[in-house]
Each structure stands twice: as structure tokens, then as C-alpha cells.
């Protein structure tokens, strides 16, 4: 089956889900969320799949929500915004319930809804120089897609509040040091480290 926003392939019992809109830094608009929910179902119930890897095309994990689509929803009124929040939460809850290990392979940049997606995985392996932000406050948006729970659970209330309220940028290495990511490695070692996780 062909997907508009996602590249999907299975090789040696590993499912590779790649956010595939590199020209826009792999945003996660609502149609992409629907595709991801469908793929998480496939990964969960296909006995040939033993492990799932999620990453972004073009050297960037995900810039988060599609700002143009978000602006259009706001112009349509509150109902569109509520639907967006609900769909993001549904996507990440479905991901968290996949009964196989899921690895987020993070590089380039990650923000907003992309961060929520990565934190819903079992493991987060990041390039140490990844540019990270929770960004919601910078666009006047409330953290959605389970972000408030996921981030607070990972780093505690004090640091989570700082990150949400400041919208500051931090590196993949800092994220790993805080416990937000599983680990960070030099960028040139990312593929090798991912391969070791897969081999386990």
C-alpha cells in the first residue's frame, strides 16, 4: 500500500517507518497521523515484524506540526483544533501500545509533535548535535499529543515546566543527559548504534 507522508518497509523482521516530507522537515499533519495509526496497527499484528524503527527522511526527524495546516484549523474555529489534539493523542497512545520494541532514531532537528512521537517510543537514540525544542509556546500553542505527560514523566515537573514555558532549544546530548532520550552518540556513530540495538 502506498502512503502519502510515510515510507514503510519491512526488512529482516524490522519495520522501518520514515516520515517522508524532507522539504518541509517532516511535519506530522493530521493525514500523516492517520497513516501512522494505520501503520502502528500493522506493526502490532504482523507476526513477521519483531521490531519497529521510526525516523525522518533527509537527515531530520520532524519539525513537529504543519504550521500552515494549524493556521487553517484555527481560522476554521475551535472544533478543528480539538480534533488535531485528539488525533495526536490517539496516534501516540496507539504507538505506546504496540507490543514490540519501538526505536526512535533522531537526528537533525526535532520539535513539538515530533518530540511527542519520539517520546512515545520505547527507546530514543539521538545524534548528540540534534537541535531539539518543545516549541509550543513559541507559536502560542498548548502542548498536545501527550507532550505534557511524556516530558514530565521523563524529566520531572521542574525541568518540564522550564522547557514548556521557555521554548528554549537544547541538544540531543542534553536531552540524553536529562533522561529525555535513551542515549546520544556522535552523529557519525548513529547508524552503527542503531544497528547494535536492532541486533539485540
Model-flagged regions — what are they?
Residues 1-57, 93, 191, 197:
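Conserved CoA-thioester-binding segment of acyl-CoA-metabolizing enzymes
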Residues 17, 54, 66, 117-118, ...:
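Hydrophobic/aromatic residues within transmembrane alpha-helices
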Residues 20, 65, 107:
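Histidine-centered beta-alpha loop that forms part of the nucleotide-sugar donor binding/catalytic region
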Residues 28, 70-73, 98:
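Helix-loop segment at the mouth of the active site in Rossmann-fold oxidoreductases
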Residues 30-31, 65, 116, 146:
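Generic recognition of short, well-ordered alpha-helical segments
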Residues 56-93, 110:
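Glycine- (often His-adjacent) and acidic-residue-rich active-site loop
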Residues 93-200:
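Crotonase-fold acyl-CoA enzyme core
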Amino acid at each position: 500500500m502506498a502512503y502519502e507522508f510515510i515510507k514503510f518497509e519491512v526488512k529482516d523482521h524490522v519495520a522501518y517507518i520514515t516520515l517522508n516530507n524532507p522539504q518541509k522537515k517532516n511535519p506530522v499533519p493530521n493525514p500523516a497521523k492517520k497513516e501512522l495509526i494505520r501503520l502502528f496497527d500493522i506493526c502490532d499484528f504482523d507476526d513477521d515484524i519483531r521490531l519497529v524503527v521510526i525516523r525522518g527522511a533527509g537527515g531530520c526527524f520532524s519539525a513537529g506540526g504543519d504550521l500552515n495546516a494549524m493556521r487553517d484549523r484555527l481560522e476554521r474555529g475551535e472544533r478543528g483544533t480539538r480534533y488535531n489534539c485528539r488525533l495526536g493523542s490517539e496516534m501516540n497512545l496507539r504507538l505506546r501500545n504496540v507490543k514490540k520494541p519501538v526505536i526512535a532514531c533522531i537526528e537533525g532537528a526535532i520539535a513539538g509533535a515530533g518530540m511527542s512521537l519520539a517520546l512515545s517510543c520505547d527507546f530514543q537514540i539521538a545524534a548528540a548535535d540534534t537541535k531539539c525544542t518543545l516549541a509550543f509556546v513559541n507559536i502560542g500553542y498548548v502542548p498536545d499529543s501527550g507532550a505534557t505527560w511524556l516530558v514530565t514523566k521523563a524529566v520531572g515537573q521542574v525541568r518540564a515546566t522550564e522547557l514548556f514555558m521557555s521554548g528554549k532549544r537544547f541538544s540531543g546530548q542534553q536531552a540524553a543527559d536529562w533522561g529525555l532520550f535513551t542515549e546520544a552518540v556522535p552523529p557519525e556513530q548513529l547508524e552503527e548504534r542503531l544497528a547494535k540495538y536492532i541486533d539485540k
